[in-house]
């Protein structure tokens, strides 16, 4: 009799995705981050649902409801800090996952790549709205600052901002709708993940060499299930250590001050995972130009497949491109650091230089280097 996992209508979908899925035999640990992101999403949805049971999306009660969760709810402090630091782990895995895709040329699977970019935008929107919910100083002023950027859109900008706010400033209506969307978006993300996997399983996984691996495939289970479990254990250990030993390491102390529209914090900044984009935004003196640069800093990923000029898919055997890739990583770290600094000399010029370099490396240097490598290899 045929095994039930191969005949049952529901189980055979799971079987073809996680058990009998043919996978390249050469996948390195850089291929672990997809499954780690799945775990992160699961942790965020679970902790988020339990937090939502005790949270109140009202400007007068939001801050106190978070305090109540931490002090009075059984293990509420654990839920709150798992959720807050889980977001940081989510973005660490996301950026490493995207970096892996860039390094090994996974972006040539354009459908999977484009759904991935949509996922990145959706997760960023979710995280931004989640940061507003505790209604501390940085929550309120971050929401005011970032939503106000939309006023740079010609003609409809001001009306659009007031429509998003639900009034003439960030207030009760804004908090309520942000809570509603923050609850809804992770489920949309989960649906997009299914589409992402659907497109990935149409083509099969890429591998470190970038060479088609059809003649040398192995079943996903037990080889990669065991490998993924090791990844889960390492990540959950790191997350637990962060939550239990220094839960506020990645947060902002200003968010422990209740939101006050009359007092502006000395330095408004988003969470660390948005600092690189925030630095690019601040590098341009013009408001509309800054907003466009901010959007393009992520949207530029969509044109990476068009800019691929190399005859090889992966960077594994392309040392010149590797140097540029790691320069890009260094530029991103620099931008993240600058985003957290005040707007003064020398930070302004460093931020502007790093922003220009970021776009130059992706748009000009990488395609030209690939052409040069082709020439050197007489291709």
Curated annotation (Swiss-Prot):
Q: Which UniProt keywords apply?
A: Electron transport, Heme, Iron, Membrane, Metal-binding, Mitochondrion, Mitochondrion inner membrane, Respiratory chain, Transmembrane, Transmembrane helix, Transport, Ubiquinone
Q: List, alphabetically, the Pfam families matched.
A: Cytochrom_B_C, Cytochrome_B
Give the residue spans that cross the bilayer: 33-53, 77-98, 113-133, 178-198, 226-246, 288-308, 320-340, 347-367
| Binding residues for a ubiquinone | 201
- List locations, semicolon-separated: Mitochondrion inner membrane
Task: Recall the GO molecular function terms of this protein's record.
Answer: metal ion binding; ubiquinol-cytochrome-c reductase activity
Where in the sequence is the signal peptide annotated?
A: none
The task this protein performs is described as: Component of the ubiquinol-cytochrome c reductase complex (complex III or cytochrome b-c1 complex) that is part of the mitochondrial respiratory chain. The b-c1 complex mediates electron transfer from ubiquinol to cytochrome c. Contributes to the generation of a proton gradient across the mitochondrial membrane that is then used for ATP synthesis.
Instruction: Outline the subunit composition.
Output: The cytochrome bc1 complex contains 11 subunits: 3 respiratory subunits (MT-CYB, CYC1 and UQCRFS1), 2 core proteins (UQCRC1 and UQCRC2) and 6 low-molecular weight proteins (UQCRH/QCR6, UQCRB/QCR7, UQCRQ/QCR8, UQCR10/QCR9, UQCR11/QCR10 and a cleavage product of UQCRFS1). This cytochrome bc1 complex then forms a dimer.
Family per UniProt? Belongs to the cytochrome b family.
The further comment given in this record reads:
Heme 1 (or BL or b562) is low-potential and absorbs at about 562 nm, and heme 2 (or BH or b566) is high-potential and absorbs at about 566 nm.
Question: Which protein, by its recorded name, is this?
Answer: Cytochrome b
Identify the species of origin: Artibeus hartii (Little fruit-eating bat)
């Amino acid at each position: 009799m045929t095994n039930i996992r191969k005949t049952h209508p529901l189980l055979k979908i799971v079987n073809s995705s996680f058990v009998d899925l043919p996978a390249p035999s050469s996948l390195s640990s850089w291929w672990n981050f997809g499954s780690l992101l799945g775990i992160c999403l699961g942790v965020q949805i679970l902790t988020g649902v339990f937090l939502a049971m005790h949270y109140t999306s009202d400007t007068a009660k939001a801050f106190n409801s978070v305090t109540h969760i931490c002090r009075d709810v059984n293990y509420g402090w654990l839920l709150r800090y798992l959720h807050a630091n889980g977001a940081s782990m989510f973005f660490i895995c996301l950026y490493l996952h995207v970096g892996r895709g860039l390094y090994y040329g996974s972006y040539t699977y354009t459908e999977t790549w484009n759904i991935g970019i949509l996922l990145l935008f959706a997760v960023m929107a979710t995280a931004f709205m989640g940061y507003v919910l505790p209604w501390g100083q940085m929550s309120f002023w971050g929401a005011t600052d970032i939503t106000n950027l939309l006023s740079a859109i010609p003609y409809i900008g001001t009306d659009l901002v007031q429509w998003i706010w639900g009034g003439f400033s960030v207030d009760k209506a804004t908090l309520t709708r942000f809570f509603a969307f923050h609850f809804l978006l992770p489920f949309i993300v989960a649906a997009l993940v299914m589409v992402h996997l659907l497109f990935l399983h149409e083509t099969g996984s890429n591998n470190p060499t970038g060479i088609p691996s059809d003649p040398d495939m192995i079943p996903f289970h037990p080889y990669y299930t065991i490998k993924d479990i090791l990844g889960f254990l390492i990540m959950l250990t790191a997350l637990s250590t962060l939550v239990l030993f220094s839960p506020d390491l990645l947060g902002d102390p200003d968010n422990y001050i209740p939101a006050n529209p009359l007092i502006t914090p000395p330095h408004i900044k988003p969470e660390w995972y948005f600092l690189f984009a925030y630095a690019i935004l601040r590098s341009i003196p013009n408001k509309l130009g800054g907003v466009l640069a901010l959007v393009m800093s992520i949207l530029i990923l969509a044109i990476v497949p068009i800019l691929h000029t190399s005859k090889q898919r992966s960077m594994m055997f392309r040392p010149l491109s590797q140097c540029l890739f790691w320069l890009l990583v260094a530029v991103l770290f620099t931008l993240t650091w600058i985003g957290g600094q005040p707007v003064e000399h020398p930070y302004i010029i460093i931020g502007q230089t790093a922003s220009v370099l970021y776009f130059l490396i992706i748009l000009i240097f990488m395609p030209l280097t690939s052409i040069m490598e082709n020439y050197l290899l007489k291709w």
